[in-house]
């Protein structure tokens, strides 16, 4: 299958390599061209713009940092005023957005693509860069059913499970935002519990073992608990500053649906505090330092 791929960052690059390993032909674009230049393979073409990718491939995957980056790729013509991605994707072409973006943007893109006879599928992923490299992502997909079946080999080249959650693309983004909201809450709760145990003379590592064995046997608690305990915040799998973006996505969706998220407001403030301490470029699990600082266990 010939696939366009836009966005070769910490997640996008290993994902693109896995598509290549699965035998797909790629047309790639990245704003920082040196990332794309790393592909030395006859099955890869390097495009000069998102519009060029869309003109050469009927299926295009985007893996970008946020709403602004995705809007820029879809709508903007760039300095050369070459046709945009939206203008050059052919009728019947498919845009698969794998980014964590807002529910409102997913709805908008579904509408604008439909007006041009194009299809839009949302397929954000659960997993960090190491999971992307080992094809161990969970792919959450929403879109038209027969189209998803056509795309299934693409998703299977990227992850261990494809979760189809509905026909409306925004539903996949809603599930991803909700899942990330749970991760944020877990990091905060774990870290507060670690501070409680440590300040009272207990061993947080032993506590985590008990929690994983007796209460919440979960990769989430095991992985993030270990990262917080051992302060494995670099290299960053997901920057803390992007965590603030994700909690804002949850709050935006909740406001639009009139759903109170009191924990969301708290977590947003925790991210702001972490940014004030200069932790923005560290992994978002560095949020777990705050309870230790506040308890006087660590210095700011």
Task: Identify the meaning behind each predicted range.
Residues 100-184:
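Rossmann-fold dinucleotide-binding core
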Residues 26, 46, 120-121, 162, ...:
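Hydrophobic beta-strand scaffold residues
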Residues 15-16, 35, 109, 154, ...:
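Hydrophobic residues within alpha-helices
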Residues 50-55, 59, 64-68, 72-137:
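Rossmann-like NAD(P)(H) cofactor-binding subdomain of soluble oxidoreductases
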Residues 1-63, 93, 129, 161:
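NAD(P)+-binding Rossmann beta1-loop-alpha1 motif at the extreme N-terminus of oxidoreductases
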Residues 171-295:
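Helical "substrate-binding/catalytic lid" subdomain
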């Amino acid at each position: 299958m010939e696939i366009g791929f836009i966005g070769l960052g910490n997640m996008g690059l290993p994902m693109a390599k896995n598509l290549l390993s699965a035998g797909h032909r790629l047309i790639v674009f990245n704003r920082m061209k040196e990332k794309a230049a790393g592909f030395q393979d006859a099955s890869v073409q390097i495009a000069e713009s998102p519009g060029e990718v869309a003109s050469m491939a009927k299926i295009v995957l985007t893996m970008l940092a946020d709403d602004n980056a995705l809007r820029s790729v879809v709508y903007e013509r760039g300095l050369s005023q070459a046709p945009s991605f939206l203008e050059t994707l052919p009728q019947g072409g498919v845009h698969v957005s794998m980014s964590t973006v807002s529910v409102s943007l997913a709805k908008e893109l579904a509408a604008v693509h439909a007006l041009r006879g194009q299809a839009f599928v949302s397929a954000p992923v659960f997993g960090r860069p190491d999971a992307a490299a080992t094809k161990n992502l969970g792919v959450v997909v929403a879109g038209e059913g027969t189209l998803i079946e056509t795309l299934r080999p693409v998703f299977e080249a990227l992850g261990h499970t494809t979760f189809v959650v509905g026909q409306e693309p925004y539903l996949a983004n809603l599930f991803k935002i909700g899942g990330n909201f749970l991760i944020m809450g877990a990091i905060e709760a774990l870290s507060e519990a670690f501070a409680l145990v440590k300040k009272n003379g207990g061993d947080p590592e032993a506590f985590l073992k008990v929690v994983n064995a007796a209460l919440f046997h979960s990769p989430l608690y095991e992985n993030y608990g270990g990262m917080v305990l051992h302060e494995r915040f670099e290299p960053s799998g997901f920057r803390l500053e992007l965590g603030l973006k994700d909690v804002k996505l949850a709050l935006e969706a909740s406001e639009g649906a009139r759903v109170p998220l009191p924990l969301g407001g708290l977590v947003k403030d925790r991210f702001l505090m972490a940014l004030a301490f200069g932790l923005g470029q560290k992994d978002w699990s560095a949020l777990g330092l705050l309870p230790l600082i506040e308890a006087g266990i660590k210095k700011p």
